[in-house]
């Protein structure tokens, strides 16, 4: 098949030569894939509006020797609200970078595509902080990395303590005895663990209704970030900027 269709969300874009763009997209049909949009950087290009980051577009592609090329592009959903708000733009950049880091090319997953689409939609229309935490948690789950939050990850004992030890290497919480043998553990309140359980149970669309105190939000963000960075073996480029933006937002009552 020389020509085929993709229904895809653009994760990122970079310029190639004067007018071409290399896109990394995540599609329903093929998962993550790199494609080229010839001439898309030209002001009068018909492809221009459909190849921007975060856009959900329909692409017709023809096969190339090294990389497949877009022959036609139609924008299906641009999430325009994201582009005119720094908080939303940063949140969208974070989840697309996160997904790009976790998934390999050529592994389609309908649930993961739906998660990404829903997250972008919710970021475009409302406050995004719990949406980000929910996206992180559910992405870990789809990647087979959902932590054990009920029993000790080493011995299997039920955890009842109000302060909980979490070991990223073990992928879950630890009892007091097993925690003494781990060099790198994180301490969290029982409330943070219960909120994390809720992130896995509830649909992403419901999480904006979840009321969480600022201390629990801080702990939850730290827990998920530590776990994510351990498995990715790197810090994401967007997290440093997101942290600075979060601190500046505290003074005006908003956060991401």
From Swiss-Prot:
GO terms for biological process: DNA recombination; double-strand break repair. Keywords: DNA damage, DNA recombination, DNA repair. GO terms for cellular component: bacterial nucleoid. InterPro entries: ARFGAP/RecO, DNA_rep/recomb_RecO_N, NA-bd_OB-fold, RecO, RecO_C. HAMAP family: RecO. NCBIfam families: reco (TIGR00613). Belongs to the RecO family. Involved in DNA repair and RecF pathway recombination. This is DNA repair protein RecO. The gene is recO.
């Amino acid at each position: 098949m020389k020509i085929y269709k993709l229904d895809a969300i653009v994760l990122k874009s970079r310029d190639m030569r004067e007018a071409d763009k290399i896109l990394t997209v995540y599609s329903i049909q093929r998962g993550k894939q790199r494609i080229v949009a010839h001439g898309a950087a030209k002001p009068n290009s018909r492809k221009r509006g459909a190849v921007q980051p975060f856009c959900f577009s329909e692409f017709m592609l023809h096969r190339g020797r090294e990389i497949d090329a877009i022959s036609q592009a139609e924008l299906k959903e641009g999430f325009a609200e994201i582009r005119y708000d720094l908080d939303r733009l940063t949140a969208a950049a974070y989840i697309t970078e996160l997904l790009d880091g976790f998934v390999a090319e050529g592994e389609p997953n309908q649930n993961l595509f739906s998660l990404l689409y829903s997250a972008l939609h919710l970021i475009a229309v409302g406050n995004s902080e719990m949406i980000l935490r929910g996206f992180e948690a559910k992405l870990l789950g789809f990647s087979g990395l959902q932590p054990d939050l009920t029993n000790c990850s080493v011995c299997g004992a039920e955890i009842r303590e109000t302060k909980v030890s979490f070991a990223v290497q073990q992928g879950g919480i630890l009892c007091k005895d097993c925690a003494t043998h781990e060099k790198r553990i994180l301490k969290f309140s029982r409330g943070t663990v219960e909120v994390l359980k809720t992130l896995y149970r509830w649909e992403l669309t419901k999480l904006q209704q979840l009321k969480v105190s600022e201390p629990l939000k801080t702990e939850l963000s730290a827990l998920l970030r530590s776990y994510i960075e351990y498995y990715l073996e790197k810090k994401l480029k967007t997290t440093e900027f997101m942290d600075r933006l979060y601190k500046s937002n505290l003074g005006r009552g908003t956060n991401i």
